[in-house]
Each structure stands twice: as C-alpha cells, then as structure tokens.
From Swiss-Prot:
This is Lysophosphatidylserine lipase ABHD12. The keyword Membrane applies. The active site is at residues 246, 333, 372. Residues 1-74 are cytoplasmic. It is an enzyme of class 3 (hydrolase). The gene is Abhd12. It is found in: Endoplasmic reticulum membrane. Its EC number is 3.1.-.-, 3.1.1.23. InterPro entries: AB_hydrolase_1, AB_hydrolase_fold. Keywords: Endoplasmic reticulum, Glycoprotein, Hydrolase, Lipid metabolism, Membrane, Transmembrane, Transmembrane helix. Residues 1-24 are annotated as: Disordered. It catalyses: 1-(9Z-octadecenoyl)-sn-glycero-3-phospho-L-serine + H2O = sn-glycero-3-phospho-L-serine + (9Z)-octadecenoate + H(+); 1-(9Z-octadecenoyl)-sn-glycero-3-phospho-(1'-sn-glycerol) + H2O = sn-glycero-3-phospho-(1'-sn-glycerol) + (9Z)-octadecenoate + H(+); 1-(9Z-octadecenoyl)-sn-glycero-3-phospho-(1D-myo-inositol) + H2O = sn-glycero-3-phospho-1D-myo-inositol + (9Z)-octadecenoate + H(+); 1-(9Z-octadecenoyl)-sn-glycero-3-phosphoethanolamine + H2O = sn-glycero-3-phosphoethanolamine + (9Z)-octadecenoate + H(+). It comes from Rattus norvegicus. The chain crosses the membrane at residues 75-95. Residues 1-15 have a biased composition (Basic and acidic residues).
C-alpha cells in the first residue's frame, strides 16, 4: 500500500511542479508581450510626433502662400480696374485733360517771390502787372540788355518801359506748360539773351504763377497779344521777335497768325521744341505710353482735348504766317519728339506764306544732351541767332 501511494504522490508533486513552472513561463511570456506592445506604442508615438509637426509646418507655409497670392491677386485686380476706369473718367470729365496739358498747378521752383526777379539772379529785371481783360491780371518780367545792369539799379517801372525805345531788339518769350516765368531753365535763357543785347519780356499766362484767371487756349493767346501790343506801343521801330517754347510754340503760332492777319507781323518767329498739333503731341507724349495701344485711344483721350477747345494747331497756323521762321529742336527731346519738329518744318518750308521769308531748322545732336529745355546751353546759340536775326545793336549805356 505504501509503495503504491508514493508514486502517486511523486507524480502529483511533479505535476504540481510542472504546473507551477508552466504558469510561471506563461506569466513571464505575457509580461514580455505586454512590455513589447508598450514599447511599440511608445516607439510609434515618438515617430508620429515629428510627422505631425512637419505636416503642420507645411500647412502653415501653404496657408501663407495662399494668403500672399490672394493679396497679390487683389492688388492686381485693383490696378487693372483703375487702369480701365481712367479712360472712362477722362472721357466723362474732359477738364482732366485740360489740367494735364496746362499743368499750371505745378509751380516749380516752389517758394519763390515772383515780385522779386533779383532773387533769381536777374538784377536788371523789373516786375510788372498788366490787365488784358477785366478779371484777368498777368505778371510780367522785363529784362534789359545786361550791359545796362548798373544803370538799372533802383530804377522804377517807367524807366524800364522807356528803355524799350532804345535801339535794341526785343524778344517776347512765351514759356511752356508747368512752372512759372521764374523756372530755372527759363531764367538761364533770359540771361543768355540779355547778354547778347536783347530786351526779354516774358509773362505768366492767366492761371500760372501769380497771374489771375482761368487757363484756356483762347485766353493764353489773348494774353500774348496784349503783351505784344503793350511792347509795340513803347518800342517804336525796334525789332520785336517772338520766341515760343514747347506748349508756348502753340501760343506763339496762334499769336503770329493773328498778327499776320491784321498785317502787323513780328520781325521773326522762333520756335523751340515745337510740335505739329496738340493731338499728335499728346499721342507722342511719354505719359501716353501705357494707353497708346488701348482700344479707342483717340476717342477716350484725344477727342476730349479738342472738345475742350484745345487745338494748338501749329501745322495749320503755318499756312497763315508770313515772317522769318527759325525752329530749334534737340534730337533727344523726350517730351516733344524730334520728328514732330522736323515735320512742322517740312510743312512750313514749302508753304506759299513763307515764300518770301527765310525758314530754317536747326537740330541739336543727341550727344549734346540738351533734351527738352537745355538748348540755351549751346555755345552755338549766339552764332545761330546772330546769323538768323542779324547782329543786335552794339552795347552802349542807356
């Protein structure tokens, strides 16, 4: 009996030992599996975090790009809308074109006292005010020949007016748009002409500088006519020449045409940087570049000019002018293209109205850099004027 129970007991003990060993192994395996899964989760979480951060950064960058593109597109649409709107605005408000042509609101240089030409280095110049019409007053400068500058000190307006009767020729200078009679390049030209023995009379059209009135082609021409008659009433038989620059050439040919029609022509007409007519000049002007090929350019931009009564038809006026004509033009003129000055000469030269008078065209090479308003710098200018107009009276005291 005892022998049979021992094996059973031993068997049970082995089974128990085996069972406890199996359960321990299973528990260890289970713990290992859990640990492995936890490690895998941690590893997965660690690798996922950089990916999610990278994705967020890319999203932010894309967002910024979209926002920038949206703003850029908005700006482009605004510019395009503005570009398209301007022609319609000009067509509906022709006065805008008149403002851009006259530019009388641009006063350069600023802060100068036009009552004091001596502040601009013109110490032999007198400031006048004339009244062409009831509600119009224009400021005038009269610069005498430079050899009289000492005698001119402290003299009044009457002395200057009497000086016009001296035996020296007179140039009536008609300036272009923008600025005043005190513009830098204009003052330098007065000095050159004065040094050559000429009286120089210039003025600001109504609406320019300190002159009172509203600008218009008719008004500008009438102002010039009034000043011319004022000069002739005081100058006796002295030669009177008319010099127009840029837009002033339009005023000059309007004036001379009227003078010729009433049979009181000037002794000569000088046109510096002239154009043919205001339509061709406006089409060739640098400001028109961005619209020059715009559909309906003439209808939108040029027709409003003529509908405002602005023509400045130099080409048409040439057919009615009978006096010597000198045209000066720089090849590198960026404002009034050289070819317009040449074209005007080609219209005038064969005209019957000039058949008994000298017509001359003087080009200035682009290498000289005289552009639109610096022809006065040319050392050849005194010779050109002397040969065309004749030698001015020898210098003498007044």
């Amino acid at each position: 009996m005892r022998k049979r129970t021992e094996p059973v007991t031993l068997e049970h003990e082995r089974c128990a030992a085996s069972g406890s060993s199996s359960s321990g192994s299973a528990a260890a395996a289970l713990d290992a599996d859990c640990s492995l899964k936890q490690n895998l989760r941690l590893a997965g979480k660690g690798t996922a975090e950089p990916h999610s951060a990278s994705d967020a950064g890319m999203k932010r960058a894309l967002g910024r790009r979209k926002s920038l593109w949206f703003r850029l597109r908005k700006i482009l649409l605004c510019v395009l809308g503005f570009y398209i709107a301007i022609p319609f605005l000009v067509k509906l408000c022709p006065g805008i074109q008149a403002k851009l042509i006259f530019l009388n609101f641009v006063r350069v240089p600023y802060f100068i006292d036009l009552k004091k030409p001596q502040d601009q280095g013109l110490n032999h110049t007198c400031n006048y005010y004339l009244q062409p019409e009831d509600d119009v007053t224009i400021g005038v400068w009269h610069t005498i020949p430079s050899v009289w500058w000492k005698n001119a000190q402290g003299k009044d307006q009457m002395w200057y007016e009497d000086a016009l009767a001296s035996n020296h020729p007179i140039i009536l200078y008609l300036h272009g748009n923008a600025g005043t009679r005190g513009g830098d390049h204009r003052v330098e030209l007065y000095k050159v002409l004065s040094s050559l023995g000429y009286h120089v009379v210039t003025f600001d059209y109504r609406g320019w500088g300190d002159s009172v009135g509203t600008p218009s082609e008719r008004g500008m021409t009438y102002d010039a006519l009034h000043v011319f008659d004022w000069i002739k009433a005081r100058s006796g038989d002295n030669p009177v020449y008319i010099w127009g620059h840029s837009l002033g050439t339009g005023v000059a040919t309007n004036l001379v045409r009227r003078l010729c029609e009433r049979e009181t022509p000037p002794d000569a007409l000088i046109l510096e940087s002239p154009f043919t007519n205001i339509r061709e000049e406006a089409k060739s002007h640098p400001f028109s570049v961005i619209y020059r090929y715009f559909p309906g350019f003439d209808w939108f931009f040029l027709d409003p000019i003529t509908s405002s009564g602005i023509k400045f038809a130099n080409d048409e006026n040439m057919k009615h002018i009978s006096c010597p004509l000198l045209i000066l033009h720089a090849e590198d003129d960026p404002v009034v293209p050289f070819h317009l000055g040449r074209k005007l000469y080609n219209i005038a030269a064969p005209s019957r109205s000039f058949r008994d008078f000298k017509v001359q065209f003087i080009p200035f090479h682009s290498d000289l850099g005289y552009r639109h308003k610096y022809i006065y710098k040319s050392p050849e200018l005194p010779r050109i004027l002397r040969e065309f107009l004749g030698k001015s009276e020898p210098e003498r005291q007044h």
